[in-house]
Amino acid sequence: MQNPPQHPEAQSPETRDREFFITAAIDYANGTPHIGHVYEKILADAIARYQRLAGRDVTFVMGTDEHGEKISKAAAKGGVTPQELVDDLSERAFQGLWKKLGISYDFFIRTTSAKHKKYVQDVLQRVYDAGDIYFAEYEGLYSVGAERYVTEKELVEGPDGVRRFPGDKDPPELRREANYFFNMQKYQPWLLETLQQNPDLIQPAGYRNEVLEMLKEDIGPLSISRPKARVPWGIELPWDTDHVTYVWFDALLSYLTPLVSQGQDASMSGKAWHVIGKDILKPHAVFWPTMLRAAGLPLYRRLVVHSHILAEDGRKMGKSLGNAIDPEELVAAWPVDAIRYALLREASLGADSPFGEGVLVSRLNSDLANDLGNLLSRTVSMIQKYRGGVIPAATEPTDREREIEAAARALPDEVLRLVDELKINMAIDAAMSFVRDLNRYIAESTPWTLAKSPETQGRLDTVLYTAAEGLRVASVALEAVIPTKAKELREQLGLGRQGYPLQAAWGLTPAGTRVQGGAILFPKPEPKADETKNAEAKPPKPQAKKEKKTVTDTAPAKTTEQKPEAAAPAQNDGLISIDDFAKIDLRIAEVVACEAVEKADKLLKLTVKLGDETRTVVSGIRKWYEPEALVGRKVVLVANLKPAKLRGIESQGMILAAEDDAGNLDLVGTELDLPSGTKVR
């Protein structure tokens, strides 16, 4: 037996192949796309975009699978021909949605196209001539949903006690049929050895282990045809026109059709990254490799398997459950780049991931609006205010600027390494950590203070340039995820729509560039109508009636003087007296330690020094500040606030902060370095 090919994966950018071939699963055109389709295509698109930014020649293939029994039934039910049905679904429902989501595929293959039919028949004839396809009669359990024969072991018992193939509404049918079969088990030893020698071939590793378990038993032959008299909607076998090829040699070969039809070598299959859902693992991990082997083509480079998207409450999503997300409604209601960001940031390949409006709004507000959008607004605004809209040159760099430059130069390799490891969410977080550090840098540098003194103008220039160039670097690191907004960000910086490679670089923003400004990059969503109803719309709470005292016959009533009625209290105008204000004890406090509160996205636990006293304060400023950035900072504390427990931690005061309409937040402090415990009055 020939040794299986090796598939080295974690290659450095210098040793990677220049060519990069990626596919997303070919979608079955018998219904409209769901949120799982959306996630998969955004995932594959982000990987493709990252590789383009890294300078690789990318070929990205998608398409629709348009033959089969289910399509014939759906067309008959709708009163149209199968071709009319797939034309509508492929062009309107699928390609239309991918365009709205910014999916940057290079080829979109339809399996009803003439070029695809020709390639399928060419490969079938080649495998048939080699003796790996034969005619036989077979009886077994057939899943209409999966469009293949299944084994008893693959069935799962439902709540009603009926065993079904996962995802099917109906139990499998017992079918006996004479079809053509592919001698798949011939290549089982080769496939097993290949998987054992290439641990990164199928990722995440848990899915590779599933396939290894499958290969412990005889995989048997694969039925690849149906009688044309029963299923006429398919590609005829070139040696027997009474049969059509069914599913596998049709759908899976669609990954290669665009290459072959463009005159490229089908051996590009050996460079492919296939991105698929876990529900079609077996066809891609067992059927497809053995088909490639029989056709004399190299095995793909990597099979990327993603899990399912769940409802926000962790339940499975479905129309029957009333919690399905309509992708068309989603893109109509929310910014596309926010959808892309939230799905990629929240989901991880190895586990089913919850998603919904709450998740989307949280990421939109905290990451995109507060962190990235506000950084852009602040930077552009300060350049306009302090430098007439022109980005100055950095003239007085300190260790802090050199630290930011080093982080910026290291970021591209870190992002690409994480993408190669399929940790897309972590790659995004690496870029956003850089953004958050830029926000801390501005807060630490206080450019608004530097602007006041002639002696610190050079320092101000350096801070403004560092912020602008840092934003450019961040935009490139995030461009694969938020492609439209990344370009808009650079336009606001005055850099036009010029593209930049994802590589270690600093100083590519020319000093003297005039910023353009523009609309808020990621506006925060307006509250829903039912969230904005004020208390006046609610009926007043009923007042408790005072119990009336009665006078008994045995107790003489007392006579009392009639007191004049008290004057009506003046209407509350929101003002307080100086005496009221004097009750508030405001003090300077120094942060000596800070940490995030577990399982609380918004809270930080601060240990502050108040003169000789040490206190614990819990504050909801986590989305603006990293814990380590606050250590050593002096803040204003409400020192005589009644203690309150937050997440089981007693908070002994309140830190004062100011937030503008754009969501920029700054802690209240003093220009002088006053001792902790100093009273504010």
UniProtKB/Swiss-Prot annotation:
<dbReference type="GO" id="GO:0004825">
    <property type="term" value="F:methionine-tRNA ligase activity"/>
</dbReference>
<dbReference type="GO" id="GO:0006431">
    <property type="term" value="P:methionyl-tRNA aminoacylation"/>
</dbReference>
<dbReference type="Pfam" id="PF01588">
    <property type="entry name" value="tRNA_bind"/>
</dbReference>
<feature type="binding site">
    <location>
        <position position="319"/>
    </location>
    <ligand>
        <name>ATP</name>
    </ligand>
</feature>
<dbReference type="GO" id="GO:0005524">
    <property type="term" value="F:ATP binding"/>
</dbReference>
<dbReference type="InterPro" id="IPR004495">
    <property type="entry name" value="Met-tRNA-synth_bsu_C"/>
</dbReference>
<keyword id="KW-0820">tRNA-binding</keyword>
<dbReference type="InterPro" id="IPR012340">
    <property type="entry name" value="NA-bd_OB-fold"/>
</dbReference>
<keyword id="KW-0067">ATP-binding</keyword>
<feature type="domain" description="tRNA-binding">
    <location>
        <begin position="580"/>
        <end position="681"/>
    </location>
</feature>
<protein>
    <recommendedName>
        <fullName>Methionine--tRNA ligase</fullName>
        <ecNumber>6.1.1.10</ecNumber>
    </recommendedName>
</protein>
<dbReference type="InterPro" id="IPR014729">
    <property type="entry name" value="Rossmann-like_a/b/a_fold"/>
</dbReference>
<feature type="short sequence motif" description="'HIGH' region">
    <location>
        <begin position="27"/>
        <end position="37"/>
    </location>
</feature>
<dbReference type="InterPro" id="IPR009080">
    <property type="entry name" value="tRNAsynth_Ia_anticodon-bd"/>
</dbReference>
<keyword id="KW-0648">Protein biosynthesis</keyword>
<dbReference type="InterPro" id="IPR002547">
    <property type="entry name" value="tRNA-bd_dom"/>
</dbReference>
<dbReference type="InterPro" id="IPR033911">
    <property type="entry name" value="MetRS_core"/>
</dbReference>
<comment type="similarity">
    <text>Belongs to the class-I aminoacyl-tRNA synthetase family. MetG type 2B subfamily.</text>
</comment>
<feature type="region of interest" description="Disordered">
    <location>
        <begin position="522"/>
        <end position="571"/>
    </location>
</feature>
<keyword id="KW-0436">Ligase</keyword>
<dbReference type="InterPro" id="IPR014758">
    <property type="entry name" value="Met-tRNA_synth"/>
</dbReference>
<dbReference type="InterPro" id="IPR015413">
    <property type="entry name" value="Methionyl/Leucyl_tRNA_Synth"/>
</dbReference>
<feature type="short sequence motif" description="'KMSKS' region">
    <location>
        <begin position="316"/>
        <end position="320"/>
    </location>
</feature>
<keyword id="KW-0030">Aminoacyl-tRNA synthetase</keyword>
<comment type="subunit">
    <text>Homodimer.</text>
</comment>
<keyword id="KW-0694">RNA-binding</keyword>
<feature type="compositionally biased region" description="Basic and acidic residues">
    <location>
        <begin position="525"/>
        <end position="539"/>
    </location>
</feature>
<dbReference type="InterPro" id="IPR023457">
    <property type="entry name" value="Met-tRNA_synth_2"/>
</dbReference>
<dbReference type="GO" id="GO:0005737">
    <property type="term" value="C:cytoplasm"/>
</dbReference>
<keyword id="KW-0963">Cytoplasm</keyword>
<dbReference type="GO" id="GO:0000049">
    <property type="term" value="F:tRNA binding"/>
</dbReference>
<dbReference type="Pfam" id="PF09334">
    <property type="entry name" value="tRNA-synt_1g"/>
</dbReference>
<dbReference type="InterPro" id="IPR041872">
    <property type="entry name" value="Anticodon_Met"/>
</dbReference>
<comment type="function">
    <text>Is required not only for elongation of protein synthesis but also for the initiation of all mRNA translation through initiator tRNA(fMet) aminoacylation.</text>
</comment>
<keyword id="KW-0547">Nucleotide-binding</keyword>
